Amino acid sequence: MSGHSYASVVDRIYSRKSSELYDNIAYLHHPSGVTVVVLRNIPESEVVEVDFGTTKKHGADRSTNQVSGKGKKGALILQPDSKLCTFKCKDGSEHVVRAGVRGTLVEMNDRLKTTPDFIRTAPDNQGFIAIITYGAGVRETEGMGDDLPPKRLFLKS
């Protein structure tokens, strides 16, 4: 049986980049300058909780932040070491996800509150962590590493 290999739908639209600072995240970078933060190293144990709170700013929940308008008024400014979320696995392990780039936090995936295992089972679509932009006219930022190989789909004929 011979099969054909095709790039996934996500990899046809976005370029997959590594983080220079953190090996547990990857970026799906769109040519428009929008970047989706996804998990790169998928834990084997089921994810049971995702916490978007932070110890700074009195534990504010990042997922409830409201962003509006063309200028993204109300968006949080991220530094490379800004914590996006912490997720806990069934085996008791806890993982911190940081931004890794300087940018503007447009959206957190609040779907992970009700279905936290999406971060493990569907990291490139329903389980994305955050959406980041970089300001007017900026398409890419420092902190993104090398291109990662695209995910391939194999169809049997």
Curated annotation (Swiss-Prot):
InterPro entries recorded: Abitram, Single_hybrid_motif
PANTHER family per UniProt: PROTEIN ABITRAM
One term of GO molecular function: actin filament binding
Domain of life of the organism encoding this protein: Eukaryota
GO cellular component: dendrite; filopodium tip; lamellipodium; nucleus
Protein name: Uncharacterized protein F54F2.7
One BP annotation, GO: regulation of actin filament polymerization
